[in-house]
């Protein structure tokens, strides 16, 4: 159960501050996998937190999923468990977006985002896929650093062409670009009378980014460079060389049906400057793009 109190203070039409006070009561239930776990009691914890955001928004809506202008958010968030222990979390980050109107309602949008966190109850970012991905797939072959005391997890998107968890860690950085072409409107020279056709968009996109543990993506303590192999009596640790940054590119179709914007994407992932899977990957998701 959670409770929030949000205070907004606008300086003018485009600048504002937002303060969020929150409390959360959580119950952790151990899965009854055997007799031992069946007897373990549930644990309950109370968390308190505060989030401060600076918002800049000069955007103007052109049509569904099409806009021009700038959007920027800087944020800091702190959470503390309201008990005798000292489990806490501090998250810092930003999200900056800019969309340029090219011709009629055709736009080119870019997004840069990054975040990191410190504390005794860490947040792990799983990079890969898109927001609101239907039938999402998770890559369980990528190792997660077990030396961190993770209390939360979230996705770092977009990274089209890969499953979730192509990269993970306590920090992430991401850059995306999209050319959005409302081709029906462009062919007709104006908006037609049917929203289904008006909303049709061809998207050409590209993503690049990484998630990591350690100070930088190239730090030796980045868990990306370590692999553990357990095979019977053999236990081995392997250090490997791999580029921490991955990318993706492809094309997609956007269309609105019954008020829902459907996103169909086909993407190819790039790792170590090579296409990871020449067959590519199909992604179906809901909602607007960034």
Regions of interest found by a model, annotated:
Residues 1-63, 71, 151-157, 165-166, ...:
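Gram-negative/organellar outer-membrane beta-barrel architecture
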Residues 38-205, 212-215, 219-235, 239:
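C-terminal outer-membrane beta-barrel translocator/porin domains of Gram-negative envelope proteins
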Residues 14, 103-105, 259:
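A cross-taxa feature marking solvent-exposed loop/turn segments within ectodomains of secreted
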Residues 2-7, 77-82, 200-216, 247-258, ...:
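A short, hydrophobic secondary-structure junction motif
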Residues 182, 209, 269-271:
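Short coil/turn motifs at secondary-structure junctions
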Residues 137-144, 216-290:
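C-terminal beta-signal and terminal closure region of outer-membrane beta-barrel proteins
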Residues 11, 169-186, 248-253, 259-265:
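Extended amphipathic secondary-structure runs
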Residues 7, 96, 112, 177, ...:
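Hydrophobic, well-ordered secondary-structure elements that form the walls
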């Amino acid at each position: 159960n959670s409770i929030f109190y949000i205070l907004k203070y606008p300086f003018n039409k485009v600048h504002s501050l937002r303060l969020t006070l929150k409390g959360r009561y959580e119950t952790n239930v151990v899965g009854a996998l055997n007799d031992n776990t069946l007897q373990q009691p549930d644990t309950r914890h109370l968390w308190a937190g505060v989030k401060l955001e600076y918002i800049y928004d000069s955007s103007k809506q052109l049509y569904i999923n099409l806009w021009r202008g700038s959007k920027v958010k800087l944020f800091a968030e702190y959470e503390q468990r309201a008990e005798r222990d000292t489990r806490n979390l501090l998250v810092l980050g930003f999200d900056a977006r800019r969309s340029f109107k090219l011709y009629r309602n055709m736009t080119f949008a870019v997004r840069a985002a990054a975040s990191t966190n410190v504390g005794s109850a860490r947040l792990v970012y799983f990079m890969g896929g898109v927001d609101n991905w239907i039938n999402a797939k998770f890559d369980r072959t990528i190792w997660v650093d077990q030396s961190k005391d993770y209390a939360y997890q979230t996705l770092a998107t977009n990274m089209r062409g890969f499953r979730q968890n192509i990269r993970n860690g306590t920090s992430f950085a991401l850059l995306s670009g999209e050319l959005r072409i409302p081709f029906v409107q462009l062919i007709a020279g104006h908006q037609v009378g049917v929203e289904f056709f008006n909303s049709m968009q061809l998207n050409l996109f590209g993503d690049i980014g990484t998630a990591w543990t350690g100070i930088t993506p190239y730090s030796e303590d980045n868990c990306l460079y370590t692999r553990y192999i357990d095979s019977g009596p053999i236990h081995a640790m392997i250090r490997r060389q791999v580029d921490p940054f991955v990318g993706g590119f492809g094309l997609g179709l956007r269309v609105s049906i019954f008020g829902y914007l459907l996103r169909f994407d086909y993407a190819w992932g790039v790792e170590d400057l090579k296409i990871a899977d020449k067959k590519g990957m199909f992604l179906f998701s809901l909602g607007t793009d960034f």
